[in-house]
Amino acid sequence: MAPSRANTPSDDELDNILNGITEGRDISGTQAESTRPAYASKGSGNAGDGLGIDEEIIITKKRIPIPKLDDNRLLSDPGIPRLRRISKDRLRFKGKGHEYGDIARMLNMYQLWLDDLYPRAKFADALTIIEKVGHTKRMQMMRKEWIDEGKPRRTSAYEEEDADEVVVQAPTTEQATESMEGVEQGEEGAERAGPDEDELDALLAESAQQNTSAPKTLPVRTAGGEDDPFADEMEAMVDMEDMW
């Protein structure tokens, strides 16, 4: 019985064991570490990465591309095409005596257009950039096309003039043909309106009968010497004819 009593712990030892104290040392921490699962110790290094608590967050800003005043922007709809539209609709020059006002309105229109197209640059700087871009091959080709569009079309003008001449000449030819037809119709009408051959023969016969029935009268010289003044000349001409 004695050995069993010696192995049995006392009440104080039981209290120490329950409180995690063995032989004056705290064993609660060592037991907790020994009982901790192995996977917890292995994944302790990546736990902060998954939760994002202990690791520093690095924020990277995305760079917004800066718009450039290049040929693509100038040839887009807000570019030179819009400038051409507003210049036709809004810009009106007053002419002689108003040169200063006309230039001021034109510069104001250019300034407003460039401010909408490329607000990052000042007016003078934007003009310098546009001048450099204008030397590119693409801009030179487009400028040539715009100049050709503004020129009057000579071929169309000549075609219109030719059409007018044809229209003017057409009535004259028609009138000439109508006049010729009228002359021919008039001649035909005159021929138709003329007397027939039988009627002409009858008229000629009547005139011949009248001539035969009429008495022949010869010119009689008056005794008073009233001769024809041309009688002597006529006789001389007759004598000359006989000589030949």
UniProtKB/Swiss-Prot annotation:
InterPro entries: Csm3 (IPR012923), TIPIN/Csm3/Swi3 (IPR040038). GO terms for cellular component: replication fork protection complex. It holds the Pfam family Swi3. Keywords: Cell cycle, DNA damage, DNA repair, DNA replication inhibitor, Meiosis, Nucleus. GO terms for molecular function: DNA binding. Residues 1-47, 172-229 are annotated as: Disordered. The keyword Nucleus applies. GO terms for biological process: DNA repair; DNA replication checkpoint signaling; meiotic cell cycle; replication fork arrest; replication fork processing. It is found in: Nucleus. The keyword Iron-sulfur does not apply. Disulfide bonds: none annotated. PANTHER family: TIMELESS INTERACTING-RELATED (PTHR13220), TIMELESS-INTERACTING PROTEIN (PTHR13220:SF11). Component of the fork protection complex (FPC) consisting of TOF1 and CSM3. Forms a fork protection complex (FPC) with TOF1 and which is required for chromosome segregation during meiosis and DNA damage repair. FPC coordinates leading and lagging strand synthesis and moves with the replication fork. FPC stabilizes replication forks in a configuration that is recognized by replication checkpoint sensors. Belongs to the CSM3 family. This is Chromosome segregation in meiosis protein 3. It comes from Phaeosphaeria nodorum (strain SN15 / ATCC MYA-4574 / FGSC 10173).
